[in-house]
A protein has these predicted regions:
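Non-catalytic C-terminal interaction segments of nucleic acid-processing enzymes
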Residues: 1-30, 34-38, 101-166
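Short, flexible loop/turn elements at secondary-structure junctions
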Residues: 30-32, 48, 69-72
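Active-site beta-strand-loop-beta-strand hairpin of nuclease catalytic cores
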Residues: 37-65
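Catalytic cores of nucleic-acid endonucleases
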Residues: 58-115
């Protein structure tokens, strides 16, 4: 698969496995610092309120950022690791994860596509090619992230998500 195809594959599976369904609030290509020379984009951002029936439930919500990395050049590019939310994940093929596992910042998690019938550890040791026919993929957390402090206000991030649309 080519880089563009891998990015589309990872994005589509992230949306269907992690971002879709009732009570999911997310946007793609969320721009931060819009209108400045330092504009940054987060591939996907999700808002996870503790509930939606009261102001306090909404205000206790957290944000999750997902940055899609399709290959080593993409990972090393220096672009797209804009982690400003409480939870931050890199989304990448298992092959790439194997190569960069030692370089990943301690608080950042990793999500990889894993065939539904395979164990994460087995997939790590012997990754399945993404273009393998007949495979049902699931996006799995292979490295949990640590919850940290948000670097932007809730209002700002919600506005940026709203401006991005889906």
């Amino acid at each position: 698969m080519e880089r563009k195809e891998i990015t589309a594959f990872l994005s589509e599976h992230l949306i269907s496995d992690k971002l879709s369904g009732v009570g999911k609030y997310w946007a793609r290509e969320v721009c931060l610092d819009w209108g400045t020379k330092d504009v940054r984009r987060v591939d996907f951002m999700e808002f996870c309120p503790t509930g939606v029936l009261s102001v306090s439930e909404i205000e206790k919500g957290i944000f999750v950022s997902y940055e899609v990395k399709s290959c080593m050049a993409d990972y090393k590019s220096g672009f797209g690791q804009n982690f400003v939310t409480e939870k931050n994940y890199l989304v990448m093929p298992m092959e790439l994860y194997k190569k960069v596992v030692q370089d990943i910042e301690g608080s950042v998690g990793v999500i990889c596509p894993v065939p539904e019938e395979r164990d994460v550890k087995d997939e790590f040791h012997s990754p399945t090619a993404l273009d393998t026919e007949g495979v049902k993929w699931r996006m799995r957390v292979v490295l949990p992230c640590l919850t940290g402090a948000r670097k932007r206000s809730m209002v700002e991030l919600l506005f940026c998500m709203l401006r991005a649309g889906k």
